[in-house]
Swiss-Prot record:
Entries under Pfam families matching the protein: ADAM_CR (PF08516), Disintegrin (PF00200), Reprolysin (PF01421)
Keyword terms: Disulfide bond, EGF-like domain, Membrane, Transmembrane, Transmembrane helix
Membrane topology term: Single-pass membrane protein
Subunit structure: Interacts with TEX101.
Annotated source species: Rattus norvegicus
Membrane-side (Extracellular) residue stretches: 1-649
Gene giving rise to this polypeptide: Adam5
Disulfide bonds listed in the record: 247-329, 289-314, 291-296, 406-426, 585-597, 591-603, 605-614
Taxonomy of the source species: Eukaryota, Metazoa, Chordata, Craniata, Vertebrata
Record-given protein name: Disintegrin and metalloproteinase domain-containing protein 5
Location of region: Disordered: 690-709
GO BP terms in the entry: binding of sperm to zona pellucida; cell adhesion; male gonad development; proteolysis
Function: This is a non catalytic metalloprotease-like protein. May play a role in sperm-egg fusion.
Amino acid sequence: MKTPISSILKSNGLGIFLYRSFITSTAVSYTYDRQDVRHSQSLSSLKNCNYNGYVAGFPNSIVSLTVCSGLRGMIQFENVSYGIEPVETLSGFIHVIYENTNQQAKIPDLGENQTYSWSDELDYQFRSNMKKSGFAVLRPRYIKTDIVVDKKLFDYMGSDTRVVLQKVIQIIGFINTMFSKLKLTVLINSVEIWSKENRIDFPEAPENLLVQFLHWKHKYRPQHISYLLAFVEHPASTGALYPGNLCKPIYGAAIALYPKGLSLESYSVIVLQLLSIGIGLTYDNADSCHCTGDVCLMTPKAIYSGGVKDFSTCSLDDFKYLSTQDLECLQDLPMERQKKKPSRPRRICGNGILEMNEQCDCGTLKNCTHKKCCDPMSCRLKSKAVCGSGECCGQDCKVKPVNVLCRKSKNECDFEEYCNGNDAYCVPDTFARNGQYCDSGQAFCYSGLCMTSNNQCMNLLGKYVRGASFACYEEFNSRNDRFGNCIRKFCSFENSLCGKLVCTWPFKRLLMKDNMSAAYGQIRDDLCISLYKGGRPLKTTLSTYSDMSERDETFVKDGTICGPDMFCLETQCKETRFLVDFQQCNTSRDCNDHGVCNNFNHCHCDKGYNPPYCESVKGQFGSIDDGHKYYIDEGKSAKQQNRGIHPKQQLQLILYITLPLIMIISAVFIKQSKLSRLCGRERSEGTSCITEDSVSNTKMTTNEGSTLH
């Protein structure tokens, strides 16, 4: 039973510093319907609403929140923890806070339990001789995981896939808050919910269940560490894994059992302890291990205790050593590469970039583009100048009119941009959204480029070189050497087109290219070539790069097609539905099938169709982002988005309004003329003439008179 300590929490009542997300850009969830049909959905919409941090004013606190649909998560202070959830019967940012407690859950004593003794233990003798080093030597690392939820846990958590998914995200989010001292982040690569039935046999013994799950993992999730979250009402242990071997592909799985009545916070601690043991940490020795708080994370007491928990000095030393062992699953963070701290922004007049406190920047004194308008020494506008630099600033020192081209299209995935009539600088670059077909349906647009292997080979080796056949790619990328690999290992069959770039070599001479070595292979009718760019391969990879984002031009680029509706991403072949978010922009629904979605998730319309919804309007085209003027139909009037109404449409509008008005006035004038002639004739005959106005006036007088009586 949740004990409310505060029934209402306003959104501005909690100050929180939020940090990075932990859902990968290609993360996906899998569920099963009543017919046992599997459905997949991208988690990209949840990527930027799951965060970790702390309560402002309470440095020794921890917060893990998801704000995707209301505020959900956990808040920890020194010795107490609270859960927070939205009140579904109330509207607005109103939430319930309750203290996290375990409802008489029977949790095995990890201090005495030998769950892991059936596996080979690591040799930890190095710790006694290891010199303690400063915490600053640790650098950010991440572990990618595939999470699986069994049928019983799905039912225990409410039998609602949306709610269960949110709870899984909460668990991983809370784990990341505890791992923050180790600078370690657990990333969610996928979440599979066995909502219909379990996909494997469930033996009673956890170690036997682990063997069953490993077979499933090797078949369906071979790339990353896999975790099975399973419900057992009264388990004999907390789970199963191979201690210290989790980073080895053959042993890369773990089972975490969820007892009845356990809080989500306590279960998160169980999952964290299992993961820590899996990478090589051990339980703490109470006599020699110490932590900043009352409870250390790698102790049995941590599962029962509320409040902030921390890794001990023993765990820190162990992890420092493990981080030097080039464990395959401990990778450098791809989204937060170690960069130099950005220097304080300062103005540099003459660099051609408009910066703070500058009115203009036309370049150096010698190369100033607008000498009549801008002083290149002070970056100030000259007298009477409206602008002094920029693509849309004319030599007359005035902003160019709307519809003037300011940036040409580079390729079929890139769009033209126009001056909007208001700004001296061209609008931001617009291009087709990632995943849009190009090259007659043979490739995909990615980051504004049409990603074809032909173009990549031509850019690397010259205009006569083309991309190789699948047979060449398969031959080279299965070699598992520096000329054929997927960075850290050989490419599996399905990823063959996403590793090293393989091209056809049409020449009879050998390649002579600085800092490049080449391997050749005659495969069927083609002479194929693969390149290696200088340097000695790292210990943990088959290249000179440890991070996917740093790989050189001898690797296939992200976005390259690798099958029907498939694209390469970080040397893996993925389905395009994980790349494209159709909820934000859909060409059929939003663009009327007469345009494509751009990088702002707005429609870029074909010629003859008007943005934003690509409705048929003669002469219109483009998007609301490219700077050109377009029209929005409001009722019966057309209103221009940027600057006034087009002269041609102004004339049409004038005619539409004035012609009916002239006709009405003419009709009234003709009617009055006829009445005047009729009255003139009747007066000459001595009869009275009563017009509509006179009748109306007579009635009004009579009514007023009767009112006075």
